[in-house]
Each structure stands twice: as C-alpha cells, then as structure tokens.
C-alpha cells in the first residue's frame, strides 16, 4: 500500500493484505478451502494452532451497549441479560441468546444481527433469508421488539454523529478516530457524498446537509475496536516469545508444541484488552492449517 502500510491498511485500522491476500482464501468451499489451507505448515516438529476470538464483534457490541447504558445512566433493555450470560459462561453463544429472546431459529437470529451490524437493508436481508420483503420487514420488527438494545445502540451512535455539536468522529476501544467527514443533502434522494465545502458548492449554501454514512457508525466502531483488540494481542504473544505465523480477521495462527502451549497463547489473547464481558478464544490444532480441528 503506497499510502499506508498493511498494518493499518483499512479505514477501521484492521490489517490489509496483498501478494497474496490471505483474507480472500476460500473458506466455505468444502473441497477447495481445506486443500489450499493444507499448504500452510507449522515449523518442523510442531503443530499448527489456529486461535480466534470467539464471536469478537457481538462481544464488542454487547460491551458498547453496556458502556452506552452507563453513560446515559439508563440500561438499554435486554443488555443486562446478555452481560450476565457472558459472565456466567464466557463461551455463551450470542446468536443463540438472540434467537431465544426473539423466538426465532439461530440461523435467522444470526443473519438479522449481522444485517443490522453491517447496515444491510430489508431487500438484501430478504434475499439472504430466502423470504419476501414483507416477511423480512416483519421478522426485523419482531427482532427489535424482543431484542431492543441492538437498534437502540445503533441509533444512539448514529445520533451522536448527527448532533450539530459533533466533531464528526467516534473513537474505538484504544482511541482510534473513526471519521465521518463527507456530507450530502438531508433528503431521501440519492446523492454523492462529498467533503463539506464541495457539498455546499454543489448544492448551494441554503441546502440543509447531513453527514453521510452515519448508519454505518456502529459497524465502523466495532470493526475499529476489533482491530484494537487483535493488535495488542499480537504484541503480547510476541513479547511472550511466540511470533504469529498468520493473522486472518479475528484469528492468529502459531506453531505450537502441544495443546497446553496453545491454551497459554489463547489466555494472552483473551486478556490483551478488557471488556465489560469476558473474552473467549477457540483453539484448533492440527498438522496444517487445513487439518486443524477444534480442541
């Protein structure tokens, strides 16, 4: 990357890759994915350990829901149940909790949660679920009724940016600024997002403008905070004497002696950054990346 290095190659601060881009290796293809991953081997005499932050983004969202509640001195409905579940069981499954509260199956609960997190519209959600737009709309309404804190947090972060007193940025766990400095007319029509001076010149000084893409604010905050968790974890394991072989999204890969060695690395990763809910890492071990299985 000629403008910025790969260790900060994305807007959110997440690592980018090229030559090759390992983040784009096929993972869902049951034949091709493992075949390519079997080419990645540990050091001689050791095993490959893939250690990833379990449901990193949902945990961060739950953390911010708690932080938002404390800041407003008003608990977002439903968030305390998630906090307690995580504290009682660090391995708790966010999507199963959502599905149970909303009265839907886990697959739909997960799809809706991720759709809201990434700013997906009703039409795309309907395609993902294989249902009509009207059914998707009703399913989303039921979700918000039973699990209201997700929508309330999304709107809260968005409102923070749209406040006239806002500097146009929010900060991640480690203080990285997520900037929203493009503008467009405050209408329902589609407009190109522009820097403020250009937007005023294009649409006139009397046109009411709004910040663009604020509906993506929670997603940007969570992505930046995920990077703010993963990078300190990499530093901690390096200082402990283990250099990661790969870093793919929320996963670090190592050459390890045995399961106990992998568990020690997972412990370092889990404690690199403190949240209001406990972190948990899943461990897969095997003779290669493609043959690593959960332990």
Label the model's feature ranges.
Residues 1-295:
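Conserved catalytic core of nucleotide polymerization and phosphodiester-bond processing enzymes
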């Amino acid at each position: 990357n000629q403008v910025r290095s790969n260790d900060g190659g994305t807007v959110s601060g997440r690592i980018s890759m090229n030559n090759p881009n390992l983040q784009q290796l096929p993972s869902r293809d049951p034949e091709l994915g493992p075949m390519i991953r079997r080419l990645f081997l540990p050091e001689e005499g050791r095993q490959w350990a893939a250690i990833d932050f379990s449901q990193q983004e949902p945990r961060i969202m739950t953390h911010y829901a708690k932080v938002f509640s404390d800041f407003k001195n008003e608990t977002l409905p439903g968030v305390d149940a998630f906090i307690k579940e995580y504290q009682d069981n660090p391995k708790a499954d966010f999507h199963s909790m959502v599905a149970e509260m909303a009265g839907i199956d886990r697959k739909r609960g997960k799809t809706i949660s991720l759709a809201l997190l990434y700013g997906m519209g009703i039409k795309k959600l309907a395609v993902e679920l294989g249902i009509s737009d009207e059914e998707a709309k009703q399913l989303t309404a039921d979700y918000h009724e039973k699990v209201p804190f997700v929508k309330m947090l999304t709107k809260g972060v968005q409102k923070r940016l749209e406040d006239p007193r806002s500097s146009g940025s929010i900060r991640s766990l480690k203080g990285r600024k997520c900037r929203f400095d493009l503008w467009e007319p405050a209408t329902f029509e589609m407009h190109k997002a522009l820097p403020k001076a250009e937007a005023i010149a294009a649409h006139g000084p009397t046109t009411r403008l709004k910040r663009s893409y604020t509906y993506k604010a929670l997603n940007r905050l969570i992505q930046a905070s995920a990077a703010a968790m993963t990078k300190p974890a990499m530093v901690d394991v390096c200082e402990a004497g283990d250099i990661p072989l790969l870093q793919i999204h929320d996963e670090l890969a190592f050459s390890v002696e045995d399961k106990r060695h992998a568990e020690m690395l997972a412990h370092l990763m889990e404690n690199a950054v403190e949240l209001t809910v406990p972190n948990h890492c899943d461990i897969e071990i095997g003779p290669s990346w493609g043959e690593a299985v959960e332990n």
